Every structure is written in C-alpha cells, then in structure tokens.
C-alpha cells in the first residue's frame, strides 16, 4: 500500500514509492530508497512536507517498529509502548539535528506510556533479555539506558517523581550525538585523535541542547557528565566521584551495562553474568558503588528460574542464588545439581528468558 506520509511521521527503514524532489524540481532521492537518518534529514532540510512511502515493503531497521516485532515473549502492550518510544525518540533526535533543539512535550510522549507498562514488569532480567535482540542504534541504546536507570533509581529508594526525572536523563544522555557527523554517532571503532576529540564533544552538545530545549540543568548535567568516572579518568572535565551528580552516577552505571551488552565487531558478545561481574569490579573505582550494588543485588534474584548455557556445552536452569558469590549460582541439569561456586572451572556462557 502506497501512502502519502508527513515528513514528521517518516521512520528509518521506510521505502520511497516515488522519487523525491525539492521545491525547485531537483531530484533528492530515488524511488525505492530505504530511508536512513541522513536521508530523512536531507528531506527535512529541503522543507518537504510529504513523501510517498510504500508501506507494503517497509524495510527493517534499528529504529523501526520491526526492531521489536521478532520478540514473541514480549507482551503486546509493552511491545507497542517500546515501538512508540523508538519512533518518538527518532522524532526528538531529528528535531535536534535539524533545528538545534527539541520540543519538551516529545520527552513526555516518549516516557509516560512506556513507564506505565514497564513498572508492572518487575523482572528486569527478562525485560533486558527481551530488548537484547535489538540493534545497538542510538535510539534503542538510549531507550535501554533510560529503562535501566528507572529501575536502579527505584531500587535506591528514589521517589516516583525522581525515578521519572532520572529515567528521562537516561533517555536524553546521548542526545548531543545529533550534532556529530553521521559516521561518529554510533561510536566508530578505531577513531583517530581528531575524530575522538570531536566524538567527545557530544557531552557538551547534549548539555547545550537540553538547556536550550528544557531549561533543566540537572538533566543537562547528566548528559555532560555521563562519561565522567569516579577515579578522574573520564571526560570532559575529569571529575572525581564527589563531583559527579547523583543522577549521573545512576545513568553512568546503566550506560556502562548496556554498552557491555553490545555485539563486538568480531561477532562475539559478553554474557549477562560476565557483564554483571565487570560492573561489580568497576564499582571499586570508576563507577559509584551504590548504584552498582543496587544493580547487582536486585538483578541476581531475577536470574533464578532462567535457563542457561554453560561453557562446557550443557544446558540447565538456575535454581538458587549463591549469597556469598552472586555470579556463581546453583544450576540444575536434569537430575544433577552443579554448584558453580565449587566447580569454578565451569562458567555460565548465556542466559535465556
């Protein structure tokens, strides 16, 4: 089905059903083009109001609704909320890219319906495993960081209003990347010194964008500080632990966790248990210990009942958390029980929903 779609409703992955021309009749994009972020930006900069989209052949993409359609275990209402949030974040990102600011009401449209749904789903491990299959695009990354920040804030005892603000700061922490060259937005590997210097500016860009758009200094500070580390090794200001805002400490833990969960260039990926171990170790120096401990101690009980694959090739189920070594639980394989705290040569490779 071919539809005439307003430019504000166009999504990455949509396919043009006709050539797109600017107001002077100069061709911009050809029929059949699968729209990328840069393509949509081009159309917006030429002030096109509507384009022809072939909805019978919409391509999948990181930010499209199909990003979560392949997750059968996800409840329909939650899936719809995530789809809507991804689309809204794209609108927010594009508005920032083309206008240098974004509408405050977009952030509420992004958050309100989603947080109502995820708050009912207390098993954060299952939620993160559901989202694990999504592409590691800026949009989905920001969504995951915002969700995990919301959980951590609640575990630390923050009020519902504070949890909302911390979650919003998590969603917006990378909004400054809208001002980066497209090749750098997703953190290109092996950047040269010049590229790395430009990439690191996204923290300041984010601060400026949020202040211009929301006039919210705390949310802006989170965007500015989310790469600061407690030992002074971060950027842009090389702050130490006590100089980092409490909200930033939470978002930084969530951001680090989600970053560790991405697929590496060689196709490898760290398992959930290994990621939790790495976060735990960072809590002694770079990350603040309170949000780290909240993450570890609240996620660990959610591992009980999950199916796992061990690095010896066997599959089993976690039946008991080990309170003295949270990363080495008791696993049942058929009639046999394996205490990983004692059999330390065996490790959990992967956790399943």
Specify the residue positions occupied by each region the protein language model found:
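Short clusters of hydrophobic/aromatic residues that line enzyme substrate/ligand-binding pockets
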Residues: 20, 184-185, 191, 230-235, ...
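Alpha-helical scaffolding flanking metal-ion-dependent phosphate/phosphodiester catalytic sites
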Residues: 145, 166-168, 172-179, 196-293, ...
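Acidic/His-rich, divalent-metal-binding segments that scaffold phosphate/diphosphate chemistry
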Residues: 61-198, 211-213
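Short alpha-helical linear motifs
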Residues: 131-134, 186-194, 223-224, 247-248, ...
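Short glycine-/small-residue-rich flexible loop motifs, especially phosphate/cofactor-binding loops
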Residues: 40-41, 150, 207
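Terminal helices and disordered tails flanking the catalytic cores of nucleotide-processing hydrolases
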Residues: 1-98, 102-105, 269-353
């Amino acid at each position: 089905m071919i539809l005439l779609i307003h430019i504000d409703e166009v999504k990455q992955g949509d396919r043009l059903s006709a050539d797109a021309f600017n107001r002077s009749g100069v061709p911009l994009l050809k029929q059949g083009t699968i729209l990328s972020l840069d393509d949509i930006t081009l159309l917006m900069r030429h002030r096109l109001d509507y384009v022809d989209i072939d909805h019978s052949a919409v391509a999948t993409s990181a930010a499209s609704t199909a990003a979560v359609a392949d997750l059968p275990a996800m409840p329909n209402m939650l899936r719809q909320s995530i789809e809507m949030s991804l689309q809204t974040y794209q609108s927010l990102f594009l508005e920032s890219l083309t206008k240098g600011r974004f509408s405050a009401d977009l952030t509420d449209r992004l958050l309100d319906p989603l947080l109502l749904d995820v708050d009912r789903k207390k098993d954060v491990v299952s939620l993160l495993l559901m989202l694990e299959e999504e592409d590691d695009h800026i949009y989905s990354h920001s969504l995951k960081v915002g969700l995990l920040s919301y959980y951590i804030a609640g575990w630390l005892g923050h009020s519902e209003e504070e949890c909302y603000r911390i979650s919003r700061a998590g969603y917006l922490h990378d909004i400054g990347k809208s001002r980066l060259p497209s090749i750098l937005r997703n953190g290109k590997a092996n950047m040269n010194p010049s590229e790395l210097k430009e990439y690191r500016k996204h923290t300041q860009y984010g601060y400026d964008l949020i202040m211009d758009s929301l006039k919210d200094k705390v949310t802006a500070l989170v965007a500015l500080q989310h790469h600061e580390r407690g030992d002074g090794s971060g950027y842009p200001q090389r702050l130490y632990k006590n100089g980092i805002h409490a909200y930033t400490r939470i978002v930084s833990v969530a951001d680090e966790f989600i970053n560790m969960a991405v697929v590496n260039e060689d196709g490898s990926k760290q398992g959930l248990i290994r990621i939790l171990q790495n976060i735990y170790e960072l809590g002694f120096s770079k990350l603040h210990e309170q949000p780290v401990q909240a993450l570890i101690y609240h996620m660990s009980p959610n591992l009980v009942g999950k199916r796992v694959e061990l690095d010896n090739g066997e599959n089993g189920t976690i039946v008991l958390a080990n309170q003295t070594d949270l990363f080495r639980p008791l696993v049942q394989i058929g009639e046999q029980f394996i205490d990983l705290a004692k059999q330390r040569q065996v490790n959990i490779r992967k956790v399943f929903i």
